[in-house]
UniProtKB/Swiss-Prot annotation:
InterPro entries: Exonuc_VII_S, Exonuc_VII_ssu_sf. Bidirectionally degrades single-stranded DNA into large acid-insoluble oligonucleotides, which are then degraded further into small acid-soluble oligonucleotides. The gene is xseB. Disulfide bonds: none annotated. One of its GO terms (molecular function) is exodeoxyribonuclease VII activity. Heterooligomer composed of large and small subunits. GO terms for biological process: DNA catabolic process. It is found in: Cytoplasm. Pfam families: Exonuc_VII_S. SUPFAM superfamilies: XseB-like. One of its GO terms (cellular component) is exodeoxyribonuclease VII complex. NCBIfam families: PRK00977.1-2, xseB. This is Exodeoxyribonuclease 7 small subunit. It comes from Streptococcus thermophilus (strain ATCC BAA-250 / LMG 18311). It catalyses: Exonucleolytic cleavage in either 5'- to 3'- or 3'- to 5'-direction to yield nucleoside 5'-phosphates.
């Protein structure tokens, strides 16, 4: 049974992929596979941030204060 990685773990994985691709020492096929993994991680991280922002807005509204957040 696999456990879901934390935001920080996914961010570290994405940073490792970016570093690996920036070195240029990766075969084309491997680079494409790593790029695809990176895109999936990037989308997951973005969704996590958007969900966190929505949660914060709800908390602020429940508290009675208004807060506008730029999306």
């Amino acid at each position: 049974m696999s456990t879901k990685k934390t935001f920080e773990e996914n961010l570290q994985d994405l940073e490792a992929i970016v570093t690996k691709l920036e070195t240029g020492d990766v075969a084309l096929e491997d680079a494409i596979a790593e790029f695809q993994k990176g895109m999936v991680l990037s989308k997951d991280l973005q969704k996590t941030l958007e969900d966190a922002e929505k949660t914060l807005v709800k908390v602020m509204q429940a508290d009675g204060t208004e807060m506008e957040m730029d999306a």
